[in-house]
């Protein structure tokens, strides 16, 4: 069963108290709690849109919700813009309702408490326009150069929901499994703030290592938005406009109910004051009647008959001690009564004027912003690009070797060091029966290899897709990489630095010559669109 309520405690922050403000004024409906012993609110009055600001995550039967957190100040700015638009539409019905795009000028993107960077804006746009979207979040990572010239990656913020200890372990496992190379050490120097140091080897490229960390670890993760919430008891998928509109509608209902409550209390107090003013104006006679009466009920009845009071007024007089009653000052009572009349007039105007109610909602939102808003923590990179495989590899010089039997590999040029006089050379591959090196070619890691076969076919391979091997390794069968047809064989190949360089491919040519002496010259552009 449910735990006893006495075991459930919470220390509320100042902002959390704003969620409960005016709950005592009959602003929301109440329902019985789990054991029907107490009543609890169906929803909180909440002076700010908590669902947007703090987000939500949960699973129910057949559905789930996952809403990101937002910056309080930005959300309130969006709500104020919605309110201003609503007022304009009251004054001029031809004004169009505020759009999601216009709200996004204020509510720019989710803002996570752990900071990080939203990488790319399409997911945010999808989430705000449709209620569903996939938002990419990157950690804050900076490359620093130490005094000794070595580089290191400093991680200062993590994507929302990422557990730091799990991340560090994952990176260590990838290094041990050789899936990420170039890392010499990892240290967690975090105290109050996150600070994880990744030491980079001298011969490694820190940017390439960081790109691999983004790809293979939670340094880059995604937040899948699914904005489902209960609206009048029914689950609905909400876009940004829907969420803001429902909040403002809720606040309008709260303001109306609070105003009616305040009006009722003000009228009740004014009614009592009318009786007290009559009593003080006739204080001697009132005291005489009370003293002459045998019971409070008799005193009430006598006062009602003599001064035309009703039961509430006479009871208020009789319930006061005579010392209190005689101490009342007529001017103070009249001043309080006059102020109450002004309040009653204002509250009635508020109930009868929708524009004034919107003004109240706007002012209360601005008050919350001035008290509690802070700076955005999560940065936004709108024009982010998808991962380019080239980002995973440094553009190093490579030696490409193809054997007589069709085995291919790439080897870093640095393995073929310069030798002095009398050197015996360096083997590009280990000798094997019936096989030998037939082609040796130098290319950069980001270059594209173009393979031409005896049957006139062309195949493309990026250099980084060619398996790396040392000088003794065999390599991989080229036929398994480019699916050469049976009986066909590579007869020539070249490498091109960048097939996307239009000026280059338009002004360079390939010349073909056949065994029968035929030749042709074709622009490189004709071969610059690789097919899978």
Language-model features: locations:
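Residues forming anionic-ligand binding surfaces in small-molecule and nucleic-acid pockets
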Residues: 51-57
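Conserved mixed alpha/beta core segments that line enzyme active sites in large multi-domain catalysts
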Residues: 16-48
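C-terminal interaction appendages of subunits in large macromolecular complexes
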Residues: 3-6, 10, 14, 18, ...
